[in-house]
Amino acid sequence: MVDHQWTPLQKEVISGLSAGSVTTLVVHPLDLLKVRLQLSATSAQKAHYGPFMVIKEIIRSSANSGRSVTNELYRGLSINLFGNAIAWGVYFGLYGVTKELIYKSVAKPGETQLKGVGNDHKMNSLIYLSAGASSGLMTAILTNPIWVIKTRIMSTSKGAQGAYTSMYNGVQQLLRTDGFQGLWKGLVPALFGVSQGALYFAVYDTLKQRKLRRKRENGLDIHLTNLETIEITSLGKMVSVTLVYPFQLLKSNLQSFRANEQKFRLFPLIKLIIANDGFVGLYKGLSANLVRAIPSTCITFCVYENLKHRL
């Protein structure tokens, strides 16, 4: 029996899709916590809203609705799982193709390719940054409708008035109340937020190639250990998330139910948040996001690197 040989693009898509799915299953409750903290930034009544207040609210909603706390914590799992699997699969596929295209457009004639590693060993941070940005822009545009529905589902308890009961119900209600353009709410800050992924990949792949280069020079297996993956992932994510977090917060608020009720627009929304909490309001929920983002990205990239290595 002949082993199936996956193409580089297939490896990227399969590894990315699998990594996104596994990560979502593990950290979904933290994602829900992050969304609700971000949405509290536009509420004067919730100016001092923190993680424990969100948890108390979830427990209270659970008691009122008769649903278990676990069900409340995993509200919106289906669409989050679907969205992250699609987004990571598309992103990794596009990123792998795009960085090769950019490299080949600037490479000198006669540049060599090492067996099994593509041209990554010849690339620099600018190529990773450019590939990450262009791939992120395309992925953000393709998946924005999913994130609008996800944000609205996760921002409310199932028993709340007007809450979406499912993905299908969410699409129906959104099209009825907001029209087709409602599917693209929050796209502008989402496109600016693409810089987070681009910065992350610039840091991650640059550090990764340095480690692999040393392994290659010492005749070792050209593959990151899980500990090495966690090390460079944590550093890259901490830097990138902190720098562009306000765009994530703005996107979540523009995609929420409250955005439709109060007719939020980007610049008035920024003014409202600053009026409620000052400039620090643009970073509301950052600590919870880092607690979620760093472990989740470590899981994503450990699954991605290991699966890609074995395909």
Swiss-Prot record:
It is found in: Mitochondrion inner membrane. Its main location: mitochondrion. The keyword rRNA-binding does not apply. Solcar repeats lie at residues 7-101, 123-210, 224-310. GO terms for molecular function: FAD transmembrane transporter activity; folic acid transmembrane transporter activity. InterPro entries: Mit_carrier, Mitochondrial_sb/sol_carrier, Mt_carrier_dom_sf, SLC25A32-like. This is Mitochondrial FAD carrier protein FLX1.
